[in-house]
Design a protein with these regions (language model features):
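Boundary at the C-terminal end of the N-terminal hydrophobic targeting segment
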Residues: 19-22
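Surface-exposed, charged secondary-structure patches
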Residues: 73-124
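Second-shell loop/turn segments in exported
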Residues: 30-38, 58-62, 118-119
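Sec-dependent N-terminal signal peptides
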Residues: 4-13
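Short, solvent-exposed secondary-structure junction/capping segments
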Residues: 53-85
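Short beta-strand edge/turn micro-motifs at domain boundaries
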Residues: 127-150
Length: 150
């Protein structure tokens, strides 16, 4: 009887230690993801998409913003050039990969290894993926929506 009682106590202690350890790991992962969402890279992406969506003249914004790479700027304007050459119109926004985007967003996730930032509009279900890249010590948006996301 003593052996069974001792075994039950040892088992209970072992289960509690494992549960405590798993909880600690889970909490540290939450802290890491929260710090990644608030990282400079993710905040640059958030600032870009918020500014872009609130502008009435997006082409002027894309021409002048310092938050994007030249590659993204070039791809953005290439879409309009191609449409003009083909006597076509651009009816969807390639930066948000759709139409009618909100003007306020929040960062959902950021992967520091891939540079992928996912944002979502406040009271909006659709998510937008952006790619950030550090160039000359400065974080810039290098891809968004359907542009340069390969």
């Amino acid at each position: 009887m003593k052996k069974i009682f001792c075994l039950a106590i040892v088992l209970a202690v072992f289960v509690n230690v494992n549960t405590f350890s798993a909880t600690r790991k889970s909490n540290s992962n939450k802290k890491n993801s929260s710090s990644q969402i608030n990282s400079e890279a993710a905040q640059v992406a958030l600032k870009f998409i918020t500014e872009y969506s609130s502008m009435t003249d997006n082409t002027e914004y894309m021409r002048n913003t310092k938050l994007i790479t030249e590659k993204l700027r070039s791809e953005y304007f290439q879409i309009f050039a191609d449409a003009y050459l083909n006597d076509d119109i651009v009816d969807a926004d390639s930066i948000i990969a759709g139409q009618d985007a909100p003007s306020k967003y929040k960062v959902i996730s950021y992967n520091s290894k891939t540079g992928l930032v996912v944002v979502q509009g406040i009271d909006w279900k659709k998510q937008i993926k952006l790619k950030v890249k550090k160039i000359n010590g400065k974080w810039l948006v290098d891809g968004s929506g359907v542009l340069n996301m390969d």
